[in-house]
Regions:
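Residues at or immediately flanking beta-strands
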Residues: 77, 139-141
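Short loop/turn elements that form and flank the Walker-type P-loop nucleotide-binding site
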Residues: 28-29, 136-139
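Cyclic nucleotide signaling catalytic output domains
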Residues: 123-134, 141-148
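Conserved long alpha-helical elements within nucleotide-processing catalytic cores of c-di-GMP signaling
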Residues: 4-5, 10-32, 39-66, 78-82, ...
Length: 148
């Protein structure tokens, strides 16, 4: 049996999220669908572990929920689908919501790192090997935005 809520984010997921998005598409009202992913999340998870990574997902959900509460409408939907955060909003201009969401996450995500990683502006990956590189700090990125 598939859960209706994601255990890490607390947001609707799976069939519940898919049904809500489908319902809004059937209604004869304009809306914007935005999907977000967290770049640098894999490197963070590898270095800091899954428990800290789960906390980052909770934080991401909180940022998105707060942005929708502040800048959205009561009919808006927030979910987590296929490893991405989803906002479906009926606001005419979602740019303010988008800027609030991304800005709050990107600034707050720095608190999950050590001071050294923040000073370096990233995580040193494959240290001491030919593949050594700096993986930038996590950023919330718009994966998809569509006006429907």
């Amino acid at each position: 049996r598939e859960s209706l809520y994601d255990s890490k984010t607390g947001l609707p997921t799976g069939p519940m999220a898919e049904e809500e998005i489908a319902r809004m598409k059937v209604e004869d009202e304009a809306f914007t669908e935005m999907r977000f992913s967290i770049s640098g999340f894999g490197a963070f998870n590898d270095k800091y572990g899954f428990m800290n990574a789960d906390t980052v997902l909770e934080f991401g959900a909180k940022c998105i929920y707060e942005a929708v509460t502040e800048h959205g409408t009561p009919e808006d939907f927030v979910g987590y689908l296929d490893g991405k955060f989803v906002i479906v909003t009926k606001v005419d201009d979602p740019d303010e919501m988008l800027a609030h969401t991304v800005g709050q996450f990107n600034e707050g995500a720095r608190a999950f790192y050590t001071f050294i990683d923040v000073d370096n502006n990233g995580i040193l990956v494959n240290e001491g090997t030919a593949n050594e590189h700096l993986e930038p700090l996590m950023q919330l990125e718009v994966h998809q935005q569509a006006d429907v």
